[in-house]
């Protein structure tokens, strides 16, 4: 009876958590990234997984007993997803989610979509030099916007009732710091592809006289956007205004981008598995000579290794 009473008071839960420390073999001090609860977990599965890969985040069904917690069923490690990615996914599953308590309740009542995130578990963090590449966005209601005040710091363009404000020096790769003012909806959408780019963008807008908070509403990786779209069966379009200003990409440049994407797509399964890709075969399929392909993939591997070392330090 005591065991049943304990289980009733401590229900099994699916948790997203990170490793704080390992006090003994197969034992891990974990932190639930949404409730911030710390718990001691016994999991030989985690020990086995850590022999072949590093993970930033873990997802598992956790049951507790009076001495420690244990995992039941699959333990899913995520190479590149962060708590912000999971929160974004949850709001796409249920648009009524507003905070961590809502998210935890959604996982408890509807765990299946979160279990399907295993399809993106091996996707790596993307970096451009030292910058983490991800969507960083915020949206505000504004009564009006005098775009003339922005011309010293921004390049401006107009199309179909929407002004695009591209921050000078920060509007190109990897930051892509831009804002879109919709004069019909009286909304201002801020978008950048790095945290630094978003910080510079909000600072420049405040310098132009518009008092906005520095915090982002959305911070999500391209990998999660892609994975969520596949799981939910619909396209998730974060940059709804960018198509109004789409510039024609030269055929040669587009072909080069397509070949690069194909090369990385073919090589990633081997890279994520920790084995050497078949450079000659992959290069031939993607339209590269082996030497060039090897150089590109060496850079990709270096970035993934850098991510792994960073996650270990954390």
Feature-to-residue mapping (PLM):
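Short nucleic-acid-contacting surface segments enriched for D/E, G, S/T with interspersed K/R
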Residues: 43-60
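OB/S1-fold single-stranded nucleic-acid-binding modules
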Residues: 1-5, 101-106, 188-190
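OB-fold/S1-family single-stranded nucleic acid-binding modules
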Residues: 62-95
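Short aromatic-glycine-enriched beta-strand elements
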Residues: 25-30
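Extended, charge-rich intrinsically disordered regulatory tails
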Residues: 210-314
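Short Lys/Arg-enriched alpha/beta "domain-start" segment
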Residues: 108-171, 175, 225, 229-258
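Short boundary/loop segments of OB/S1/cold-shock single-stranded nucleic-acid-binding domains
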Residues: 1-15
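OB-fold/S1-family RNA-binding modules
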Residues: 91-116, 179, 194
């Amino acid at each position: 009876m005591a065991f049943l009473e304990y289980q009733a008071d401590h229900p099994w839960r699916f948790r997203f958590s990170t490793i704080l420390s390992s006090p003994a073999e197969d034992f891990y001090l974990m932190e639930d990234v949404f409730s911030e609860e710390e718990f001691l977990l016994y999991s030989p599965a985690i020990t086995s997984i850590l022999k072949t890969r590093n993970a930033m985040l873990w997802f598992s069904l956790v049951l507790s007993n009076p001495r420690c917690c244990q995992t039941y069923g699959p333990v899913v490690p995520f190479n590149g997803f962060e708590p912000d990615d999971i929160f974004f996914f949850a709001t796409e599953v249920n648009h009524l989610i507003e905070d961590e308590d809502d998210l935890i309740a959604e996982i408890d009542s509807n765990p299946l979509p979160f279990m399907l995130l295993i399809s993106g578990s091996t996707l790596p963090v993307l970096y451009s030099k030292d910058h983490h590449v991800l969507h960083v966005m915020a949206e505000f209601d504004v009564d009006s916007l005098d775009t003339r005040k922005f011309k010293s710091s921004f390049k401006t363009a107009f199309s179909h009732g929407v002004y695009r404000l591209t921050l000078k020096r920060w509007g190109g790769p990897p930051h892509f710091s831009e804002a879109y003012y919709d004069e019909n909806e009286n909304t201002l959408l801020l978008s950048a592809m790095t945290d630094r780019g978003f910080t510079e963008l909000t600072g420049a807008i405040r310098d132009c006289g518009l008092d906005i908070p520095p915090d982002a509403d959305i911070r999500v990786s391209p990998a999660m956007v892609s994975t969520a779209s596949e799981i939910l069966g619909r396209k998730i379009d974060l940059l709804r205004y960018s198509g109004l200003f789409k510039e024609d990409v030269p055929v040669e440049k587009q072909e080069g981008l397509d070949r690069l994407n194909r090369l990385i797509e073919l090589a990633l399964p081997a890279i994520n598995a920790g084995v050497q890709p078949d450079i000659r075969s992959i290069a031939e399929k993607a339209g590269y000579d082996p030497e060039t392909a090897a150089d590109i993939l060496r850079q990709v591997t270096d970035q993934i290794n850098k991510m792994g070392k960073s996650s270990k330090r954390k």
